[in-house]
Amino acid sequence: MIKYLSIIYFLFSSISFSDTTIVALDQVHHSFGGLGNNRTSTNEIQFPNGSTDYSSITMRVNLECPTGGCDPWDRKAKISVYHIDQWIEIGRYVTPYGVECGWEIDVTDYRSILRGEVILKSFIDTWVQPGWLVSVEFDFVEGQGQYPFTVVRNLWNYDRLVYGDPTIPVDISTIQEYLPNDTEEAYIRITTTGHGQGNTENAAEFSDKRHDILINGEVSHVHNFWRPDCEFNDCSPQNGTWQYDRAGFCPGDKVDAQNLSILDFSLPGNTVEFDYVLEDYFNQCSPNNPSCVNGVTCTSCAYNNTGHTEPFYYIGSQLIIHTTNKHSNADVYLSISEQDTSLSSVDIYLENYVSVYGVSFKLDLSQLEIQGDGNLSFEDGISGRAEESNWTVSINGEGLIVALAQGSGEPIQPGEGILTRIQLNLENISILSGSLKIIDVEASGYFGRQLSFETGEPTTFELLNTNEELIIPTKIMLHNAYPNPFNPYTTISYDMSEDNFVNLTIFDLAGKKIKTLLNESMVAGFRSVRWRGLDEQYQPVSTGVYLCVFQAGNFRETKKIILLK
């Protein structure tokens, strides 16, 4: 055992990653006026491909004054990343009154979206010509973080949620999300700032309001985002009223996101319902209030661009899930599960954070080599989560799979596991080899809403030979797994000199059963089965040494295999 653990240590220690700094923006001018609308700057950035190999990621934002001076006003601003068809806010700040400043923001929670080619957007809500020169850098610090795998899911995101006006009712949607079985930590990461002044209670910039966050219908957190410390701002002195405390921000400072725990109220493997309920408030100083009287109810009932502006909240939030193993950030994740070439079938794995009402995709056959007189064909899908939900799974000769609820069928609820099994018809096919992958995915949610998706890596048929004139092995044998150590999968080959009942099971070193790969009658021949490092619930297992126990009749043999992540 010490020998194998030494191999693991050597492989880990031989992989070296160094600290890395990525310059995303370098003095990019944000302004509005004669130079045009340059309040937003969008750039494509190349981040490290393996962001899980860094213990922390820090975003540094620096503001400088262009020729003519800085914007004299405090402006809300944010940095966002485009990921799987949506923008995700990773940091917010408010500019100072007319002076230069800079901040560091911990963005380690966004490691899963800060990798490879990334589209980054910088926005400042400036309306004047001078504006700002914006520089943004990311510092990646090498090492293993506490949570190397993180899921990021958008929750409530509103650029302008009007507050206290019954003619513009607040409509914050209820959101349901799934927590994977291997969740180690989960929380709501929320950033709320209030804006507008000259209203009842001077809302929403200068009014201290507490909003409720509900988990599964019960108040889990009272959201207190008031900033009582603006006079201690490091970015000082400034011009203007920077010392006054505000709702969620201070001029010339970053806006710290708040992390609100979830696992105290819901367990992994369950669907969680989230609500955000604002404290009751009525703005009597609104032009939409028929009872408002100038100089009586308020100084002025009309909004203007100076002392009386509409109260609203600027809300950004995500569900952050730290897991033992890697998961997708998309609504739907489809992959071809571990492939046993002796079964002549393909298992389709589905992980979905939201309810799925329909899905279609195609098995790409272009990379398969087929030899023989027959044609590869498929049978409609059976078993799995689709069948449990009374769905039908149909497939045509080109590999197009359509899975739909029929009649009394229900949507597939959030969760993870095998969606369906597709049987391959291999009559008169002697050799089938190559790779198979999922393409052309379309997934729909409630009322036909298009769902985001990602797909897994292609699965490879090492060799599937159905020729009846095969050479029969002379003895039963279990071969060493290859590759070993492995990640993400290994192939376990075995020889059958006669027809027999076969059991092949993976155990950990404590003797706990991890996964039964085979437990059925097999005919004589050279065979193999693949293990992708998943347990019986199709959940990824951790790095370590495992035992592969093979039994065919009275023959029994054990091999060690090593999973590295």
Label each PLM-derived region with a short phrase:
Residues 78-80, 212-214, 360-362, 503-507:
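Beta-strand signatures of extracellular beta-sandwich domains
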Residues 19-328:
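Extracellular/secretory-pathway and virion-surface proteins
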Residues 516, 521-524, 529-530, 539-565:
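C-terminal tail/sorting-segment detector
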Residues 342-351, 355, 465-482, 486-507, ...:
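Glycine-centered coil/turn sites that cap beta-strands in beta-rich domains
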Residues 183, 192-194, 206, 353-356, ...:
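Short proline/glycine-enriched turn/loop motifs at strand-loop junctions of beta-rich domains
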Residues 173-175, 418-422, 525-529:
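Short strand-edge motifs at loop-to-beta-strand transitions and within beta-strands
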Residues 327-470:
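Acidic, low-complexity intrinsically disordered segments
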Residues 7-18:
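Hydrophobic h-region of N-terminal signal peptides that target proteins for export
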